[in-house]
Amino acid sequence: MESPNKMLRVRTQHPIISIVNGVLVDLPAPSNISYYWNFGSLLGLCLVIQLITGIFLAMHYCPDVSLAFDSISHILRDVNHGFMLKYIHANGASLFFLCVYIHMGRGLYYGSYMKMDVWNIGVIIYLVMMLTAFLGYVLPWGQMSFWGATVITNFCSAIPYVGTDVVQWIWGGFSVSNATLNRFFSLHYLFPFLIAGLGVLHILSLHTAGSNNPLGIDSNIDKVTFHVYYTYKDLFGIMVLSSILVILCYFMPNVLGDPENFIQANPLVTPVHIQPEWYFLFAYAILRSIPNKLGGVLAMVFSILVLLLLPFIHTSKLRALTFRPLGKIAFWFLVADFILLTWLGANPVEEPYIMIGQFASLFYFCYFLVLVPLLGWAETTLLRMK
């Protein structure tokens, strides 16, 4: 049996194991972080699950317009445990985005965006995730896949002067075709590895800047080692997430999908209502709330990029919303607004959904551009009053 000293020496001095040790074992972590800090490790788990299931699915998938739909059927019916691979991959993507939204919400609530490098890399990861998920949604080559690809890629035609050329360049022709499916499959296979690389940068920059905590104050004098205090906490979160994923995949595998995608893509028949997956619906609702095409596209893009402005428009002397009652109220209004926009995105483009969507979109941008700086200034002023 090896002595503890030798084990410690290997753990801390080995060129590769020491990196893992610094991330998972001896990492100094604030002593008061809550379960909201679990979602970083859960996102790592989701990414690994998506990579493994995606690689195995790619072994049986055919990126050809005449074979793609049938190859999905082949995976479900003929491949050993193929149905589990497909449903874990599809529902795993939903849980991935759910964890991302909670992770980002925690960052907004506790002011984690003040660590700019960590936050900016996180926003870039989110953008690449959205692109990857969109590319993957096209691959089953069902009706919603085909028409979703047609509608979303057509937004690029709103770019002045070169829009039409850009769309045809993306399509590889004059419509969504075999060339489109091929390049979407190729990029969908590539981007998760890019996300993994950005994830490593995210973790490295986090360890350089140090973790935030629920109080939003410097915690350098009160830290504990990551193992054993938070590894077991993370394991509990992993068990809960795994249980939810297994229940989804076995008992309701298609609950988050669209029935239209059980019909093979037909360029001659348009679905009654075209909509993306649930995790894009808030941005889709913002896009549709503006009647001008270019304006809608800009609003949709800016709804994500506005997150990059947060470190510059934070005016409060307090980082977290823990001790900011006005900021707390505004934040929970934002959460309600996000849920409302998600619901509106799944509804048809008609009244009263259009008008409600316009008000909800207006509040979304007002929160970031008006309420965050205004309430920060107001609360700081009130704190200084004697």
Curated annotation (Swiss-Prot):
The main subunits of complex b-c1 are: cytochrome b, cytochrome c1 and the Rieske protein. Component of the ubiquinol-cytochrome c reductase complex (complex III or cytochrome b-c1 complex) that is part of the mitochondrial respiratory chain. The b-c1 complex mediates electron transfer from ubiquinol to cytochrome c. Contributes to the generation of a proton gradient across the mitochondrial membrane that is then used for ATP synthesis. Keywords: Electron transport, Heme, Iron, Membrane, Metal-binding, Mitochondrion, Mitochondrion inner membrane, Respiratory chain, Transmembrane, Transmembrane helix, Transport, Ubiquinone. Its cofactor is heme b. Belongs to the cytochrome b family. It comes from Sarcophyton glaucum. A ubiquinone binds at residue 207. The gene is MT-CYB. One of its GO terms (biological process) is mitochondrial electron transport, ubiquinol to cytochrome c. The chain crosses the membrane at residues 39-59, 83-104, 119-139, 184-204, 232-252, 294-314, 326-346, 353-374. It is found in: Mitochondrion inner membrane. InterPro entries: Cyt_b/b6_C, Cyt_b/b6_C_sf, Cyt_b/b6_N, Cytb/b6-like_sf, Cytochrome_b, Cytochrome_b_C_euk/bac, Cytochrome_b_N_euk/bac, Di-haem_cyt_TM. Its main location: mitochondrion. It is a multi-pass membrane protein. This is Cytochrome b. GO terms for cellular component: mitochondrial inner membrane; respiratory chain complex III. Heme b b562 binds at residues 89, 188. Heme b b566 binds at residues 103, 202. Binds 2 heme b groups non-covalently. Heme 1 (or BL or b562) is low-potential and absorbs at about 562 nm, and heme 2 (or BH or b566) is high-potential and absorbs at about 566 nm. Pfam families: Cytochrom_B_C, Cytochrome_B. It comes from the Eukaryota. GO terms for molecular function: metal ion binding; ubiquinol-cytochrome-c reductase activity.
